[in-house]
C-alpha cells in the first residue's frame, strides 16, 4: 500500500503494509518530518505540583529534608545514586544534574507545601528521531501515594508531545517492580528486557523498556486528565476512582 488512509483507527493502521518500488516492505511514511524541538528548562505548572528548572541553591535543602523523611534508603536500591546524607552531598548531587547538558532536569514543587519534594529529568533526547526518555525519577516519601507524582509525569509527557516528540521512553531495573507498575499505570507499553544492560552499584542490571507513542497519547492524556480532575478526589485527597477506571473508559 502506497498511501495512508487518514480515517483508519490506530488498530487498523497497525495492519497496513507499505511496499517500495522493489516490492520490499517498508515502514509507514512520516510526512513533513523535521524533527522535534528541544524541551526547555522552563516552569511547567500543574494544579497540585509545579515543575521548576532544577537549581542546587534553590532546591537542595528541601530535597534533602524530603528524602530524609524515609527511615532508611531502600527506595534508592535500584537508582544510580545513593541517598545524600548531608546538605553538601545533596547540593553536589543536584548540581551534577543541573550541569549535565544531556539532561533537562526539574524539581517537583508541591504546590501546597511550596517546596521541592522530588526531582525528574528528560534524558537521552534525540530530536532528529523524536525520541526522549523520562528518567532520574527520584520521589521522596512526601510524594508517595499522592497525586503530585502522577501529575508531575503527566506534565512531562504533555510537554514532550507538545514539542513534537513521537516516542517517550521509560526504563527501569528489572527488579524495580514499583517503577514497572508506574509505567504500565500511566499507559506505557512494555517492549521487553535488555539483558546485562549495565553494571549498577557493582551488580548486574537488566533493564525493562517501555514506550508511549504520539498516536497513543490522546487516549492516555484523556484518562490522566479525568483522573487528575478535582471531582475525582475527596476533601482529604483520596481518589474516588483509580486511573485504570478512566483508561478503560477512554476511546481507543
Residue ranges of model-derived segments:
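Conserved catalytic-core motifs of GNAT/GCN5-like acyltransferases
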Residues: 189-203
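Conserved beta-strand-loop-alpha-helix junction that forms the acyl-donor binding cleft
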Residues: 170-180
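Serine residues within intrinsically disordered or low-complexity segments
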Residues: 9-12
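Conserved acetyl-CoA-binding loop-helix of GNAT-fold acetyltransferases
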Residues: 145-158, 181
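GNAT-family acyltransferases
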Residues: 14-146, 159-163, 203-252
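Conserved GNAT acetyl-CoA-binding A-motif
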Residues: 162-171
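Conserved active-site tyrosine of GNAT-family acetyltransferases
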Residues: 182-183, 210
